[in-house]
Amino acid sequence: MTVAEIKKLALNNQVFNEAKALLEKGNVIFPKKFLKRKKIIIEVLDGKVFKVQINLKTAAAHLDCSCSNDKQNCVHIIAALLKYNDLKNQDNKEFDLNKADKLECKEVEILIENVSLAIVNGSWKLKIGFVINIDKVQTNTTALRFYCCDNKDVYFLHTEDEQLFRIALDKFNSVERQTLLIFDQLNKTKQMQYENNSLLFNLDQFLSLVKEVKKPSLFLLNEDKTDNILFLRSQHKINGLSHVCGFLNNKVFDFVSYNEKTKQIVLRLAYLNKFTDFKFPYNINIYKLAFGETLFFHFLIHLKMNGFKNIFFQSDVVIVKESEYLPKMFLTIEFNTQKNKFITDAFFKYKNKNSNTLTTVYPHRYYLAQKTNTSNFNRLLFYEQALQRFYEELFQIDYLRRFENIPIKDKNQIALFKTVFDDYKTIDLAELKLTSNLLNYKQLHFSISDIKALKIEDRQLKIEFKAGGIDLKLIKSVLSNYYKGNAICIGEDGWYDLNDENAKALISFWSQIDLRNATCDANNNLLLAKYHLFEVVDTISKYTDVTNLLDEKTALQLKIASENQFHLSLDNNQINNLRKYQKEGVKWIRALEDNQFGGILADEMGLGKTAQVIFAMLDSYQSTKSLLPSLIIVPASLLLNWKSEFQKFAPHVKIVTANGNFKERSQVYESLKNQILLMSFNVLRSDIKWISQKKFHYVVIDEAQGIKNENSTVTKAAKKIKGNFCLALTGTPIENRLLDLWSCFDFVLPNFLGNKKQFSDQFEKEKNDESFQKLMKKTSPFILRRTKNKVLKELPKKIITDIYVELSEEHQKLYDKQKTDGLKEIKESDAKNALNILSLILKLRHICSLVKDNDVNDFEDNSKANAALNIIYEALENKRKVILFTQFLDVIDCFKQTLKNQKIDHLVFDGRKTVKNRNTIIQKFNSAKEPCVMLASLKAGGVGINLTAAEVVIHFDVWWNSAVENQATDRAHRIGQSKTVQVYRIIAKNTIEERVCQVQNQKQELVKKTLVEDVNFFKSLSHEELLKLFE
């Protein structure tokens, strides 16, 4: 406690000043040795004697005075605290011998706090931590023994000059003099240093000096400031035995004796028992070695390190060999290449009493200590733990437990293991074992000239190597460690430095090839799935001319697939109705099929993907003469569309549809031969048990974004279907996230992009240019995407216009109130849930569209609705048909009522309509002779329907995902459209709609990098990023 803190405890400044006066007069009297007491009584003279009691255990929380003042912290208490503070501050203060009267010099006890071994600059040091105990003062002494006075070296006040030191030595007895001579010699030879209240000795030098002392030497050590003082005394006796003794509670205990003739060392356990409490707690992990145990153990280690082998232990009158008393430790450190991690195994073996058998115990199982049957041996837990900690420090391992995992670091870690192993394997403390792969350093090898040939065999890509083949397991391990950031790789028979030039060359090459599902043949040639052909050829071509490695068949397959030169068996009359890009699409599909690949046809909506698939199937059946049926899975709303397309392009092909009840569907399945089976997603989900038992020629999924959720029953069902060739059709391969693309590929080319986690770690989490380019390069041979502006030069333009409107005053007030209340609720909530913010965004978008809920009668105060109605009126006057898309069904109802009141022809197309009704509505809209309006929900507009009769498209509420918005627009802007399509987006200024558009515009870069459509960025935005939308 400081003086300032004591002053705060005083009732006022007057009380504090009076207390200081009592202190300065010497009127505050403390008892002797008060520092060791938990409760002390202080006498304060103030007219009479007042007694102040301080409970040191609870500090200043319990203060009491015998004066009549009933107020706390009276002048006597403050005076006592000031005196206590002064005395405490004197602790550890330096005595200046030169300024002191020698007759009044006092002997000060050096209290040793800990004794331990340490390695300093590669040498063993004995470290003794100490404090100077002012409380133990003896008067009747003429000089200080020794004292440390700076932070670098140790000096003795007696040795300020040599003459003064010699004079001082005369004042000591022989034991004290010999002690000082030893410390002074250590100091002069720089073998002793002072660091952080510790004396640091060179252990060998220290012990050798002690041995040379002919008279008893005294070293004063103390544990935890107790009265149990240990004097280590080295003395020679006539019988030739050297002794080091312990002094405890005024009794001397023999610690160790050494017989120079027999070279026999005897450690006496009576000493150890005096300093060790053997009552171990259940939770031994928190057990701290006692002072005696620590000293005993380090002394034993030092003896062994200096070559002493003839060591015995004495208990009472029985002397036994060390091996009979101490357990043997067995320590193994290995690297398990199967689990790719270090594993340690540490245990002790005790010799059983009256037999030559051994009992094994594990040091980490402390909680079993009480249950272990120790009737046949004396278990030394302190020794187990001390030895365990000793090797933990040597190997720099946190815990030496059985099966403990140690992280891989770098070659310095391996060097440390080997150094410790070499230095300590001969010391009879433990039997050390390091597996050979930790002791052998090996170098990796890579040369492109080692590759002998590339060929396709049995639907697999084989990379043949020259003599010796390839060590695939090692290469995978090297790459795995490299990706984890490790600097080394440990194999079966040695370890490798990954920063070595050869390793860098190997990693550079093989990291470009997906080896996750690779295997080897009997000759250690590499076997990969056939679809890896393109990436392997591309990688090798960076190093050498790959054509020299390809056999004729493989080279031809590669040329046909990469240059799209597949020869169709259909004659020109059959495909004359197709456009050039569609013919290329048919060839691309057939080339994939011919090479046993799968693919994704991702042409922009309106480019005729259906026709390309139909002609590819026709060519395939004509060429292969397959007798298997083919399966086409589509949304229910597109069943009739596909059927009509077949009737249009291939009327001779028999089409069957899986509909009706299960009995009717099962009859279709049973009679199925080489027909085309059309099936909806819902039927697939219900009938997958039967479907999965059939084998199909083609398996096609239209609107394949329907299987983007890998956990849905439809997706799982689709991936159970067996087909010779699988094809996915989608205009939006990436609708919400990159995983949508993975799910499609997992259907057409299982394992091509790894599993979900592997794909996410490699591509989705990284989201950088390098990972995007790698993904594009890998997938480009198996995904075909064309856009209308590239392949349909004759297609009329699509003109997009954003119309910004300001909400009316009342409308804006309603919006602002909802926004303020919603944000307040979110910010006051403890949970950072993005769904709460998305829910608020949805509410605000809805308010932008409607002034109030269910306002079905009046659009007069709704500026957005009025803007849309003005566009509708103008379009109808110009004889143009209109589609208005919205997300909200109640908005559709409002427009429906308004148009009805205006007696304007209109149709409604949304999810509330049956599939049959939807097709009728589409036909009615397209065939209507007079201009009319279709009110459609946005999602209903995104499932393959054809609305080319429309010339004006209105998006009433901006959709988060512009890909869905574009998909709806392209129902009008597609093949068959002969007029310019005008697209309007109605956006409310100063609202969330405006912010959504801004964010979408900023994020368009990702679309370009990932080859395909837009991404719903809102699903990937953090809580904080979503809140920024409201700024």
UniProtKB/Swiss-Prot annotation:
Domain of life where this protein originates: Bacteria
SMART domains attached to this UniProt entry: DEXDc, HELICc
A Pfam family recorded for this sequence: SNF2-rel_dom
Family membership noted in the UniProt record: Belongs to the SNF2/RAD54 helicase family.
Gene Ontology MF term list: ATP binding; chromatin binding; DNA binding; helicase activity; hydrolase activity; nucleosome array spacer activity; zinc ion binding
Disruption of the gene: reported phenotype: Not essential, it can be deleted.
Location of the Helicase ATP-binding domain: 590-751
Keyword list, A-Z: ATP-binding, Helicase, Hydrolase, Metal-binding, Nucleotide-binding, Zinc, Zinc-finger
Name of protein: Uncharacterized ATP-dependent helicase MG018
Enzyme Commission (EC) number: 3.6.4.-
Gene3D superfamilies in the record: P-loop containing nucleotide triphosphate hydrolases, Tandem AAA-ATPase domain
Residues noted as binding ATP in the record, renumbered to the chain: 603-610
Span of the annotated motif DEAQ box: 702-705
SWIM-type zinc-finger residues: 50-85
Gene Ontology biological process terms in this record: positive regulation of transcription by RNA polymerase II
Keyword Zinc-finger part of the UniProt annotation: yes
Organism in which the protein naturally occurs: Mycoplasma genitalium (strain ATCC 33530 / DSM 19775 / NCTC 10195 / G37)
Domain Helicase C-terminal: 868-1022
